[in-house]
Structures are given as C-alpha cells and as structure tokens.
C-alpha cells in the first residue's frame, strides 16, 4: 500500500494509521467490529515532499508536520533525487514519441539540460520554482500542440515563476537553445524549434 503525499493527510486520519505502522500492526474497524491483520508480505510505503517536517519552505502549502511518534514508526526513510539526465530524456521521449528523431532527441536533451539548470538554481537560491520532470513533459507536449517550443516553455514553466526571476530563466534558456526569449524570437546557431 502506498500513501501518496502522506504529509498532506489530516491529523485525525494520521492517528488511525499509527497502529498500522507498528510491528505486526493491525487496523481495527470499530463500526464493523472487525480487526484487519496484514498478510506477512504486506508492505507499506509513503511519499512526501517534506520528509514529515511540514512546509518549511513555502513550496508545499497544505502539508502537515508529521507527529514525531509516528515518524519514529517508519523503519526506513529514503530521499530520492531527480533522475539522471539520460533517464529523464528517455522517459520524455517515450511519453512523446514524436521527439524520437535525431533532432527531437537533441531538443529533449536540451529541455532536460534547462530543467537541470533550474534545479541547480533552486538549490543555490537563484530560483524559487523548480522544473520537475512533469513540467518537462508538459513542455514537450505543448511544443507539439503549439508547434512553438519558446511559447510552450513560457506556458509550461516560465509563467509559473516569479517575474523577478525571469532574467535568470531567460539566461538558462539562451544557454540551452541560443534564443533570447525577451527578443523577437530570432535564434542563434544553437537552437531551433522542433518541427515534427
């Protein structure tokens, strides 16, 4: 069983889960006078963005700090980082197969490069919004819909960002595609809009 976005759970619900987290834990359904005991192979997982600490950054509004007693019942806590560049590129191409050409693969690789830059910028405090693999996928899909990579980028990511950070974002874009998003859209030799 996977509790997705576990730290967004309501505290009254979280206490019901606490008993299940115990070794050989069980769930009691009082209204049905029933006790549910898990199969020996049963495993419980949870995903969070805050590692149970609540929204300390302002990025995950609606999350709750998880009770320390409940956190203590989780035997293993793992932090997952972003995918490798090649893995993320392969996933985007598998989801948007129109990009599975030489030019398309180069285009997606540059998109992922920009996403990597945004993540580094976020870590360094230059950006307050990070580009997730989901955003890169939206950008690729919107590039096909609008037949315009630059517009698709603005609609998929840049418009979500603080305007005071647009200069940094425009610089990242120029590095990856050779296009100044604030100009008339004329490209340098590095970039081109994807054309099927």
Per-segment meaning from a language model:
Residues 1-196:
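C-terminal regulatory/interaction module of P-loop NTP-utilizing enzymes
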């Amino acid at each position: 069983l996977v509790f997705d976005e576990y730290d967004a759970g309501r505290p009254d619900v979280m206490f019901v889960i606490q008993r299940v987290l115990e070794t050989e834990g069980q769930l009691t359904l009082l209204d049905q006078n029933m006790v549910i005991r898990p199969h020996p192979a049963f495993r419980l997982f949870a995903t969070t963005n805050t590692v149970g600490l609540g929204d300390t950054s302002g990025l995950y509004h609606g999350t709750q700090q998880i009770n320390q007693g409940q956190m203590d019942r989780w035997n293993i806590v793992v932090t997952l980082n972003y995918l490798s560049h090649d893995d993320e590129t392969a996933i985007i191409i598998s989801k948007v197969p129109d990009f599975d050409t030489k030019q398309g693969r180069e285009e997606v690789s540059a998109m992922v490069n920009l996403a990597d830059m945004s993540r580094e910028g976020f870590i360094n405090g230059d950006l307050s919004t990070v580009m997730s693999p989901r955003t890169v996928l939206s950008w690729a899909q919107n590039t096909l819909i609008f037949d315009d990579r630059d517009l698709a980028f603005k609609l998929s990511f840049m418009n979500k960002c603080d305007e005071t950070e647009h200069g940094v974002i425009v610089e990242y874009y120029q590095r990856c595609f050779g296009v100044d998003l604030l100009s008339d859209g004329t490209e340098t030799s590095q970039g081109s809009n994807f054309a099927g």
